[in-house]
A protein has these predicted regions:
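A general structural signal for short secondary-structure junctions and capping/turn motifs
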Residues: 11, 58, 116-120
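Charged, gly/pro-rich active-site loop segments
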Residues: 71-152, 172-259
Length: 259
């Protein structure tokens, strides 16, 4: 029965184009973001391009994570790897990326994209444990992420109307009192417009006291020129991240050598 449940959860994750990744941010506070969920050899995987590696640094500080996608959740302690030469992307991700993220169909067909978009085909990889995956009914459009009773991170779907502009939001999440993060994510039909609103605060019985808001659900219409500028900015960000990424590779290599 466990194997059947795990297999169905993996199938659900494989079918999902978007999910919610929960992790421990600075100050030991849980935070979440919308991600593309992948599988690699039957193991749930979340990645960052080399331009946007903030969540990778967080997981290296605290390996407790959770991924909710397609009505299935993986949670536990993650491992991190830096796969920056594009070979792993080609082998493990390219087909999934083309299927799940429509804008990739343009990017990955550009002549010379492996050289021009080296930061896109290079990835920092978070691998989650497949053992213990379970079905979690409900949509992941609105979720709350917190530290659960077992000390690990959980991402919990929220059903019903949520008053996003309120300072005190009524929530029935089943999580212990403490810091929590409410995330709402929306995507355009072709995923050219990705939007998320994050509310961080303190969870008490039945309510979230909001302390910080970031992001927006307002639709944006980026012109082709603006999108090209965005790609150039991401390339510059990845270049600026190189020293940091190399230090992670050294650290992870040392950990593997001592393991």
């Amino acid at each position: 029965m466990h194997n059947m449940c795990c297999a169905s959860s993996l199938a659900a994750l494989e079918d999902a184009a978007v999910g919610v990744f929960g992790f421990i941010g600075r100050g030991g506070r849980p935070v979440s973001c919308a991600v593309t969920p992948y599988l690699d050899g039957g193991q749930p995987v979340v990645t960052s391009t080399l331009a946007l590696v903030g969540k990778i640094g967080a997981v290296l500080r605290d390996e407790r994570v959770a991924l909710l996608a397609g009505g299935a959740q993986a949670r536990g302690r993650a491992t991190v790897a830096i796969e920056d030469d594009g070979e792993w992307f080609d082998r493990a991700l390219r087909a999934q990326e083309l299927r799940k993220y429509p804008p990739a169909r343009f990017l990955l067909r550009l002549p010379g994209h492996r050289r021009l978009l080296w930061w896109y085909v290079g990835r920092a990889v978070v691998r989650l444990p497949a053992d213990g995956m379970r079905a979690v009914p409900g949509s992941d459009r609105v979720t709350v992420t917190g530290i659960d009773h077992d000390g690990l991170v959980s991402v919990v779907p929220i059903v019903g109307d949520v008053q996003l502009d309120a300072d005190e939001i009524l929530l029935l999440a089943g999580l212990p009192d403490g810091p929590a993060c409410l995330l709402v994510h929306e995507e355009s039909a072709g995923q050219s417009d990705l939007r998320q609103l994050r509310l961080e605060g303190e969870l008490a019985p039945g309510r979230l006291s909001v302390q910080r808001r970031s992001g927006t659900l307002a639709a944006t219409n980026r012109s082709p020129l603006a999108q090209i500028r965005d790609l150039a900015a991401l390339g510059r960000a990845a270049t600026a991240n190189r020293t940091r990424i190399e230090s992670w590779k050294t650290r992870l290599g040392q950990e593997a050598a001592h393991g």
